[in-house]
Amino acid sequence: MDELTRKVLNSFAHWRKETLDLHELFEAGGNDPDASTAVFDIVERLVKEGLLAEEGNDFYSLTEKGKGKLAADEHG
């Protein structure tokens, strides 16, 4: 898993929230406009892969599949 994808998935633990809006997820990219575009693309990909769920109004949650993928990545 690439570093930016890991940061996006770890955002839920960082903010200690079950759901995050897109602007909070953009924080994973810092202040770099190119990174914000990359975060947007990553979020779309993670939704398609079932790792994030769209909750409406630009809010997203980490699915059980996403939690498992993140845990597996952290353990090697």
PLM region spans:
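Short amphipathic alpha-helical interaction segments
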Residues: 32-48
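Amphipathic alpha-helical interaction segments
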Residues: 3, 7, 41, 61-64
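Accessory beta->alpha helical hairpin/"wing" motif in late/C-terminal subdomains of nucleic-acid enzymes
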Residues: 57-69
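Short amphipathic alpha-helical interface segments
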Residues: 1-31
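Short, low-complexity, charge-dense intrinsically disordered segments
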Residues: 73-76
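A short, conserved structural fragment
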Residues: 47-57
